[in-house]
Amino acid sequence: MCRRKPDIMILTQIEAKEACDWLRATGFPQYAQLYEDLLFPIDISSVKREHDFLDRDAIEALCRRLNTLNKCAVMKLEISPHRKRSEDSDEDEPCAISGKWTFQRDSKRWSRLEEFDVFSSKLDPAPGAPAEAPLKTAASHESMLTELSERQEVASVLSLSSTGSLPVHAPHAGDAATPRTNSVISVCSSGHFVGNDDSFCSLPSPKELSSFSFSMKGQEKNAKSKTRSLLKRMESLKLRGSPHSKHKAPSKLGLIISGPILQEGMDEEKLKQLNCVEISALNGNRINVPAVRKRSVSNSTQTSSSSSQSETSSAVSTPSPVTRTRSLSACNKRVGMYLEGFDPFNQSTFNNVMEQNCKNRESYPEDTVFYIPEDHKPGTFPKALSNGSFPPSGNNSSVNWRTGSFHGPGHISLRRENSSDSPKELKRRNSSSSMSSRLSIYDNVPGSILYSSSGDLADLENEDIFPELDDILYHVKGMQRIVNQWSEKFSDEGDSDSALDSVSPCPSSPKQIHLDVDNDRATPSDLDSTGNSLNEPEEPSDIPERRDSGVGASLTRSNRHRLRWHSFQSSHRPSLNSVSLQINCQSVAQMNLLQKYSLLKLTALLEKYTPSNKHGFSWAVPKFMKRIKVPDYKDRNVFGVPLTVNVQRTGQPLPQSIQQAMRYLRNHCLDQVGLFRKSGVKSRIQALRQMNESAIDCVNYEGQSAYDVADMLKQYFRDLPEPLMTNKLSETFLQIYQCVPKDQRLQAMKAAIMLLPDENREVLQTLLYFLSDVTAAVKENQMTPTNLAVCLAPSLFHLNTLKRENSSPRVMQRKQSLGKPDQKDLNENLAATQGLAHMIAECKKLFQVPEEMSRCRNSYTEQELKPLTLEALGRLRNDESADYQHFLQDCVDSLFKEVKEKFKGWVSYSTSEQAELSYKKVSEGPPLRLWRSTIEVPAMPEEILKRLLKEQHLWDVDLLDSKVIEILDSQTEIYQYVQNSMAPHPARDYVVLRTWRTNLPKGACALLLTSVDHDRAPVVGVRVNVLLSRYLIEPCGSGKSKLTYMCRADLRGHMPEWYTKSFGHLCAAEVVKIRDSFSNQNTETKDTKSR
């Protein structure tokens, strides 16, 4: 019994320390600070009122920790203070979920924005315990809750909320006090108390408070020894699970959803700008669709419009077949309307739509057909078209010569027709234009078996629908051979790298020429999970098309290629209403806050539904936040390389060859039965692996077996050093599908995904979207989400590897001797399968900001940190007469101040690139470091400046498009450029104010960039916020220059941890690419002269 009490005390101290760690990790660091400052206990009810936007489970998880700290405060248990943040610390940026607290960077402490009493003279009673009277004060030194200490604790905390310097009065302090009281008195010695408990005198400001020190006097040495002994015992003791109070079952009342409500501020002018049309006011008229413009990489907030080309049969205005096909595909996929208040379940709406459809059918005669000239060359658009009535006999059917589709009588074979109401109107491809059925004839099915539009066998015995069927089949077979030869001729061409290119020279496969539609429905193999076409014309090449002359400096284009997969990006583009909720659009401060809320939500759910021995306080802090030394991967390029290393090398977490394998399967192999289920040939798979290791950027998969490529893709994820879900969180994912109820699993999964490292989350999103497209062709490949999960779950979760690592040799030997897995293994495999299948089915909802975050708008929306306008940049100087030119001059002065001080205070950072890399912490703004990379370039400063300004496409392999928005003066302009991202993630959009200087001392040049908000710059992706970007070019003799690049930017969708681990490597890689562009130019010039 004598030894049991110290053990209980040690365990309670461990719980207190881990409770403080949990509070910091979940967005409540202010309470951990109060406990370490010996200012507990606190009033739990006040905390609940302060966080009323949280749900019940999250509040209960918070209160459990606070009650633990209250108990420890009464027991006089102390923990070691949280270590102070140093300049080289990798600790997370302080972040509080509540918007009523702010972090004072000068004093490194939390303070309240308004007075709010969280202290009470009594503790909250335990659940089910009767209410007790307030604790009485005592004169003994052992008392922890004397009246004096309570009042002084309140005064000390309220002083944290002071934002200005206030007058200070001396107190009356003569009584003896405990160490806790002494520490409080030392802080509040300048405060004066009056008789009323609720009224206090003026209190010190946070700056004044930071100058005070807590005096421990005689207790200091004893406390240090206690701390050391505590830490030693914590290493040897394991946390014992403690039973938790049972929670009431959640309310079973269903969620009540009201009807559509018009948003505030949506006046008539706003509705007119959004092209909104009142449904009831249509009156049978069609909606005019605006004209299509030159295609660019567009964000989902923009609505692409349809083509406005002339619909006449003129040969001059008729586009090529590929152009027309692309236009139709783009229009039908992206043209949309935002109908505010539209009720799709209103019966009157259905009646109007049905009446409109009937009018559409009656507006076209059923005997209209378009004739193609006899000398028409297959594969090209006809030079002239004529329409008329069907002949009385013989030619009462028409064939689409490009696809082999046969149309029965009465079907209009051309999809763009003239209308009496609107001559230039675009008719939707999937609208009903005929009451008769459409039949398709293919050369790979028996001629006696024809399927009608509904999928049933056509009754050919009762009526001879096609009198010249043999001739038609003969022509179709010939056409198929020609089209195959035509597609093979251009199959090696790659994607276009321009963001404004809308068409390619030819489609990459016959499937992409035309999307078959049967009775207004696309075939499953041609649709992705969102209903968009999978076979839209793919950008032909992985090698960007040259936009230069091809001679001289244009020969220096980088040899590193980037995959252009625009169809994958466009098919999974979020809707207009959900674009702001996408994770990849959030700022770094919002991501930091979102991660802490996700940890809070996940902890609350797991503690509520999992057994007490399945979780503990130690679960709270994910291990990926800790610094881990990784081995060297110089001898590997693809397989076995961590995703973080891929980001540091190329800027993208997935290697280019793996992305190309996914694109090959998505474009050409979705009709293969049992894809990912049937095994490939080992020798061919090994050959594919060697191809990936040797040719990282460009691997040609043409002619490869779909099953070989799919197996190679599985092996890639299986060979990762740790599972895609990470070693720590894989077990958490399995617990979610073993213990959490079905209706709560989606919330738990969204929270767990936010705890993944950024590169793992991005790869998971890409993979899930890709697998959802595979399941969209389930009628052909027979692969449902569950079937795919059975095949891929072991590779993604590393189930077998985890079992071997977590099991002892004796246990593994016993399992092998029994020849069957135990029940735990079966449950984990089932949970992994169910989890992956659920993630595939709900992939679009997993990567969105939870709706609960909108309840704490004060703390979340303020963290967005949008770029400033030109006028706002001038106001940063607090000078009414200042403008953006004064801001730019200040930037130039600060740059040369760094140079004059020889970059004092910068910390060196190791990188695999051949450049010097260092960083410097910045106290203002978002939690982002300022990075600096330096390299020697074999060119003069003027040449380097020209390359940075005018020739970005020669060294930036991710560049999609660029243009100058506005020229402000001879050395200042607004510049916009777009960079590619790994599909299906949206492109990155930069709008910067840039200025350059060439008349600097010693022949140096400088280029400065800062993001701005400009009304003439359309949003064509995720808008990046460049806080600071500087290029300094100094001559160093022998025709060489020293290039120094400094950058601090918020790329959106990344945690602070990602910027610490990866962003610096990207800065170093950028200067290396700039240098290589000149090195390649010099090498090619020498080779030309030698010839």
UniProtKB/Swiss-Prot annotation:
Q: Which Gene3D superfamilies match?
A: 1.10.287.2070, 3.30.530.20, Rho GTPase activation protein (1.10.555.10)
Mark out the compositionally biased spans (Basic and acidic residues): 414-425, 513-523
Residue numbers spanned by region Disordered: 292-327, 382-439, 491-553
- List the molecular function annotations (GO) for this entry: GTPase activator activity; lipid binding
> What residue stretches are annotated with the SAM domain?
11-78
Site (Arginine finger): which residue positions?
R677
Q: Which domain of life is it from?
A: Eukaryota
* Residues with Phosphoserine modification: S86, S89, S320
Q: Which UniProt keywords apply?
A: Cell junction, Cytoplasm, GTPase activation, Membrane, Phosphoprotein, Tumor suppressor
Q: Which residues form the START domain?
A: 877-1084
User: Is the ATP-binding keyword given for this protein?
Assistant: no
Q: GO CC annotation: what is one?
A: focal adhesion
Q: What does this protein do?
A: Functions as a GTPase-activating protein for the small GTPases RHOA, RHOB, RHOC and CDC42, terminating their downstream signaling. This induces morphological changes and detachment through cytoskeletal reorganization, playing a critical role in biological processes such as cell migration and proliferation. Also functions in vivo as an activator of the phospholipase PLCD1. Active DLC1 increases cell migration velocity but reduces directionality.
Subunit structure and binding partners: Interacts with EF1A1, facilitates EF1A1 distribution to the membrane periphery and ruffles upon growth factor stimulation and suppresses cell migration. Interacts with tensin TNS1 (via N-terminus); the interaction is decreased by phosphorylation of TNS1. Interacts with TNS3 and PTEN; in resting cells, interacts with TNS3 (via C2 tensin-type domain) but, following growth factor stimulation, TNS3 and PTEN are phosphorylated which leads to weakened interaction with TNS3 and enhanced interaction with PTEN.
What information about domains appears in the record's comments? The SAM domain mediates interaction with EF1A1, and functions as an autoinhibitory regulator of RhoGAP Activity.
Instruction: Name the PANTHER family on file.
Output: RHO GTPASE-ACTIVATING PROTEIN 7, RHO-TYPE GTPASE ACTIVATING PROTEIN
Q: What is this protein called?
A: Rho GTPase-activating protein 7
Recorded source organism is: Canis lupus familiaris
